[in-house]
Amino acid sequence: MSIFDVAVWDEAEHCARMLDQRRLPNEVVNLYYRSAAEMADGIRDMVVRGAPAIGCACAYGVAVEAKRLAKQGIPSHWPTAMAEGMATLRQSRPTAVNLTWALERMAPLLETTPPHEVPQRLLQEAHAIREEDIASCRAMGAHGAALLPTNSQRPTVIMTHCNAGALATAGYGTALGVIRAAHTAQQGNLRVIANETRPYLQGARLTAWELLQDHIDTTLITDNMAGWLMANGEVDAVVVGSDRVAANGDVANKIGTYTLAVLARRHDIPFFVAAPLSTVDLRCPTGREIPIEERSANEVTHCMGIRSAADGVKVRNPAFDVTPAELITAFICEKGVAKAPDQEKIAKLFQI
């Protein structure tokens, strides 16, 4: 068992297992899931987060639902039997396109697999999705590491936002995969600035913890310090992940990403986005069509369970924002790199 096993199949318990990321970094706790409804609750409640990891969790959610139904007797028509559970999973996090991608990959198997083999076949496909994601992350890490600047006078300093690492994927990470690969390529001569990422503190709780596990020099800042550090020449590049990429290269990512992209452009700092092609939604023409999840006001008014805002104040809590493609230096995926991404360049990545 790896400490970064965020969404896997537990052979001993015969069900899905997820690392409860809400408890990090203070506790390492695993939770177990035996139905699609339970898995959807786990996804919605952010036990797991990060688009690729959500996709893996969703796939295992389909597998556990089939296993649950099979215990009651093999359904005469699997698509009908699975419809409610799959709909529940689909609605759990609307912005992360990998969730829908995983469901659409699993659904045809309900029609084409002999009925008695469906539960095992779905589990095999969930395993395949997980293994493919790990390989994808390592490939984009190699592509991205070659793009990052080097600094002969001091360690290269990379800023990142939210958590796009092993905890947000099946393993290794997208943005942090690029950072891990660059750290190796530059023989450790690299530092990371992790934005704390209000209001859920994924940068402080997850990214800082994850990078420290790998002994990568990491400095934590509050989100509103980023511009000052850029203005003072303390940042060489910004690398982030994505929850959905539109066909034209616009990117939805954790709220605050757009702000960083604008600041990076102002200070001539390269701004990179790393995500697998499964995160690209070719049916979504531009970022304007990406649904933006609005989460609970409590995430803003409370911090680690303690109220920090005036009682009765109104709250906005969009979980994501959209960064226009024109602000992105390059989009990095497992197939390669699209510099100054646009619709034509994104489409070409699917042809490699």
UniProtKB/Swiss-Prot annotation:
It comes from Magnetococcus marinus (strain ATCC BAA-1437 / JCM 17883 / MC-1). Signal peptide: none annotated. The active site is at D243. Keywords: Amino-acid biosynthesis, Isomerase, Methionine biosynthesis. Belongs to the eIF-2B alpha/beta/delta subunits family. MtnA subfamily. The record marks C162 as: Transition state stabilizer. Substrate binds at R49, G50, A51, R93, Q202, N253, K254. This is Methylthioribose-1-phosphate isomerase. The keyword Amino-acid biosynthesis applies. One of its GO terms (molecular function) is S-methyl-5-thioribose-1-phosphate isomerase activity. Catalyzes the interconversion of methylthioribose-1-phosphate (MTR-1-P) into methylthioribulose-1-phosphate (MTRu-1-P). It catalyses: 5-(methylsulfanyl)-alpha-D-ribose 1-phosphate = 5-(methylsulfanyl)-D-ribulose 1-phosphate. Pathway: Amino-acid biosynthesis; L-methionine biosynthesis via salvage pathway; L-methionine from S-methyl-5-thio-alpha-D-ribose 1-phosphate: step 1/6. NCBIfam families: eIF-2B_rel (TIGR00524), PRK05720.1 (NF004326), salvage_mtnA (TIGR00512). Its EC number is 5.3.1.23. GO terms for biological process: L-methionine salvage from methylthioadenosine.
